[in-house]
């Protein structure tokens, strides 16, 4: 009998070259694992039964590679993809590591840096499309400030808008089948990063030349750093038709960007996130933007990757149990099952409905006195999660 918690292609689980390829380096310590080549990472992901691999341009092709070196590296990568069946659903540009981007890429005060960032991104888009990417993520890790004396925030937003407009026109001119997904983060590595939350980007997108081409890529850790409910951000993006991609990991609220294995820390919120994605039928990739503990060797990295996918499927199973639990569903149905006899029906605005509502005698005390049984509902939810229901 097959394991119901083993990944299958329809689950669309993906990892980045930079995630499973992380050698365990951090700001306070040197690498603890050997660096894996992109080809080795593709074979590792095939071994753990992932669906796809994502990459920054320089995860695959070094920033100073010659054209001949670039072609050789990409050729070897394509061969590994063909051998394993691993897909490339998403790509992105590294606009944060090189010293040229120390004051931002698209929002840099230096027009030469802004122009270079556009050129680098166009080449990276070409590479991503060549390898099959249909989503292109933008994370502006350096698009911010340490001191507000250094930049005009309105001018910075204008520069960012102009860059995205340029790139959407480029994609259309090339006739690429590609959409953009913008990823928010409040801080780190900059003291403050512009457009710090998913909600910020949802507003910003509507100011672009081609908003239909641009959505968001919410990340658990980044919203938790702001102390926000991640599932609510995802729901807002879904409601707006802008949930083009998602980054799954875990994070203690208010900490530095921890990139913990998905579902390993915030158990209840991870459950409601998976439940939401499955309830609405989110069709996109489930991308794990997280890292194995620095204590691990390469075998531990495989455990991390397998654990990420298995945990998602465990939460998915719990969501099914929650939906099928009779007592839970009775409580949920009862929330809206209240007598409304005689109350004006509320729908689209009409003058008659407005007058009827203003004239209706609501029993305010009865409304306030009604118990909602949320304690019982939450307790039953915990019992599902803890495996006793």
Language-model region placement:
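N-terminal pre-domain/capping segments
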Residues: 1-135, 165, 210-211, 217, ...
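Short acidic/polar active-site loop segments enriched in Thr and Asp
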Residues: 51, 134, 244, 283-284
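Acidic/histidine-rich catalytic cores of soluble enzymes
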Residues: 8-15, 147-269, 367-389
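Alpha-helix-loop-beta-strand connector modules within alpha/beta enzyme cores
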Residues: 67-93, 157-174, 202-210, 268-280
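Residue-level preference for long, well-ordered alpha-helices that form the structural scaffold
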Residues: 30-37, 66-73, 110-114, 149-160, ...
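Short acidic, glycine/proline-rich loop/turn micro-motifs
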Residues: 25-28, 101-104, 148-151, 256-260, ...
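Active-site-proximal loop/turn and secondary-structure-junction residues that shape catalytic pockets
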Residues: 19-21, 57-59, 92-97, 140-144, ...
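Active-site/pore-lining binding-face segments in mid-to-C-terminal subdomains
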Residues: 249, 257-329
């Amino acid at each position: 009998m097959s394991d119901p918690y083993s990944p299958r292609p329809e689950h669309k689980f993906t990892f980045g070259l930079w995630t499973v390829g992380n050698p365990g380096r951090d700001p306070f310590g040197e690498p603890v694992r050997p660096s894996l080549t992109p080809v080795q990472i593709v074979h590792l992901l095939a071994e753990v039964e992932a669906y796809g691999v994502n990459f920054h341009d320089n995860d695959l092709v070094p920033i100073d590679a010659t054209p001949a070196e670039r072609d050789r590296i990409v050729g070897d990568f394509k061969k590994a993809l063909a051998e394993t069946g691993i897909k490339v659903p998403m790509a992105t540009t590294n606009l944060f590591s090189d010293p040229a981007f120390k004051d931002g890429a698209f929002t840099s005060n230096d027009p030469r840096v802004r122009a270079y960032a556009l050129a680098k991104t166009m080449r990276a888009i070409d590479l991503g499309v060549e390898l099959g990417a249909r989503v292109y993520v933008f994370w502006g890790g350096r698009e911010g400030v340490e001191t507000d004396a250094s930049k005009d925030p309105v001018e910075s937003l204008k520069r960012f808008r102009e860059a995205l407009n340029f790139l959407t026109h480029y994609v259309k001119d090339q006739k690429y089948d590609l959409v953009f997904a913008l990823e928010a983060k409040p801080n780190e590595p900059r003291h403050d990063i512009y457009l710090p939350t998913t909600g910020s980007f949802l507003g910003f997108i509507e100011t672009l030349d081609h908003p239909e081409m641009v959505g968001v890529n919410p990340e658990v850790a980044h919203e938790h750093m702001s102390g926000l409910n991640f599932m609510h951000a995802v729901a807002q993006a879904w409601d707006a038709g802008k949930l083009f991609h998602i980054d799954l990991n875990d994070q203690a609220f208010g900490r530095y960007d921890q990139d913990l294995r998905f579902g390993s820390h915030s158990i209840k919120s991870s459950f409601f996130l998976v439940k939401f994605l499955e309830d609405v039928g989110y069709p996109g990739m489930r991308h794990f933007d997280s890292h194995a503990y620095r204590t691990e060797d390469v075998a531990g990295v495989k455990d991390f990757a397998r654990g990420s996918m298995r945990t998602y499927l465990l939460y998915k199973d719990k969501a099914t149990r929650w939906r099928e639990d009779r007592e839970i569903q009775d409580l949920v149905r009862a929330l809206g099952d209240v007598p409304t006899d005689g109350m004006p029906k509320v729908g689209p605005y009409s003058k008659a409905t407005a007058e009827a509502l203003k004239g209706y005698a609501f029993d305010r005390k009865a409304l306030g006195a009604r118990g909602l049984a949320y304690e019982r509902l939450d307790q039953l939810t915990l019992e599902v999660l803890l495996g006793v229901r």
